[in-house]
Amino acid sequence: MSTNPFDDDNGAFFVLVNDEDQHSLWPVFADIPAGWRVVHGEASRAACLDYVEKNWTDLRPKSLRDAMAED
C-alpha cells in the first residue's frame, strides 16, 4: 500500500498561494501547478503548517473578501 506524499511528516514541502490567497502544502519533488506560487519553504511539513496557520487567517477567497469590502 502506498502512502500519500502530502501526509509525509518527514518530507520537504513548499507553501503555495494562488490568486485567491488560498494556501496549499506541496511536496518539493512535485511540479508547481499553474496559477500557484511558492511563498514559503523548502521546509518541513510542520514548519509549513505553522506558516499556513499564522498567515492564512481568513479562509474566504480574495474575490469574496474584496466584494464584501465594497458593500
Curated annotation (Swiss-Prot):
GO terms for biological process: siderophore biosynthetic process. Signal peptide: none annotated. SMART domains: MbtH. InterPro entries: MbtH-like_dom, MbtH-like_sf, MLP_fam. GO terms for cellular component: cytosol. Disulfide bonds: none annotated. Could be involved in mycobactin synthesis. To M.tuberculosis MbtH. This is Protein MbtH. The gene is mbtH.
